[in-house]
A protein has these predicted regions:
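Short, glycine-/small-residue-rich phosphate/pyrophosphate-handling segment
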Residues: 131-162
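Short beta-strand segments
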Residues: 6, 35-36, 59, 100-102, ...
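Short glycine/serine/threonine-rich phosphate/pyrophosphate-binding segments
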Residues: 13-17, 82-83, 104-111, 149-150
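Short helix-capping segments at alpha-helix termini
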Residues: 25-28, 46-55, 166
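Short, acidic/small-residue loops that bind anionic groups at enzyme active sites
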Residues: 110-142
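N-terminal phosphate-binding or glycine-rich loops at protein starts, especially the Walker A/P-loop
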Residues: 1-40
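Phosphate/nucleotide-donor binding subsite
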Residues: 50-95
Length: 169
C-alpha cells in the first residue's frame, strides 16, 4: 500500500509526521509519499537517517492551507497546497490512501473538488473506524454535523455501507 501524507497542514509543523512516516515504512509493508515543501522534508529525512529510504518519496508542493482559512476558498485558490496536491495523487492512482493532520474542512473540500461524490449523496461525511475485539466498526460523522435532515441520515447510511464494503474488498 502506498500512502500520501500531507505533512504541511498541521499546527505543529512537519517534524512528527515525517518521523512517523519513517517509523511506519520501517515497521510495516507500506510506501509513503510525503507531500509538502521538499527542501524541509529532505532536511528532516536526513535528520532522521532516512534520506536514502527507498520506501519514501517526496512530492513537492509550494503552498499550505492554514487552519484559519476558509476551506472551500483556500482549496480553490491554492492549487499547489499540500492537501490539494495529495488529493490529486490519490485521484490519479499514484497512491492508495491519503492522511492529513491539517484542516479537516480543507481535506473535505479537496476531496469534494478533486475526487467528486457518490451519485445521489449531497453532503460528505467523515468516517471514523473504531477497532474492537470483534472487528472494526465505522462511525460516520462522529458529531460533525448538528443540522442533518432525515435524507442526509439515509445518505450517510449509504456512504458508510459503501465505505465499509470498499474497505473489505
Amino acid at each position: 500500500m502506498k500512502i500520501a501524507v500531507d505533512v504541511m497542514g498541521t499546527d505543529y509543523g512537519p517534524q512528527e509526521l515525517v518521523l512517523g512516516a519513517v517509523q511506519a515504512v520501517r515497521a510495516y509493508d507500506c510506501e509513503v509519499v510525503l507531500v509538502g515543501d521538499s527542501e524541509i522534508i529532505k532536511k528532516l529525512l536526513e535528520e532522521y537517517n532516512a534520506a536514502d529510504e527507498r520506501k519514501i518519496t517526496v512530492h513537492h508542493s509550494s503552498e499550505v492551507i492554514n487552519m484559519d482559512e476558509h476551506p472551500g476558498i483556500a482549496v480553490k485558490a491554492k492549487k499547489d497546497a499540500s492537501i490539494v496536491v495529495a488529493t490529486k495523487l490519490l485521484r490519479d492512482k499514484e497512491c492508495d490512501a491519503l492522511v492529513s493532520s491539517g484542516s479537516t474542512g480543507a481535506a473535505v473540500a479537496a476531496a469534494l473538488f478533486g475526487l467528486g461524490r457518490i451519485r445521489g449523496i449531497e453532503r460528505p461525511a467523515i468516517a471514523t473506524p473504531i477497532p474492537s475485539l470483534t472487528g472494526t466498526t465505522v462511525v460516520l460523522d462522529s458529531g460533525a454535523k448538528v443540522d442533518a435532515k432525515p435524507e442526509h441520515m439515509v445518505q450517510s447510511a449509504i456512504t458508510v455501507s459503501y465505505t465499509h464494503l470498499r474497505a473489505h474488498e
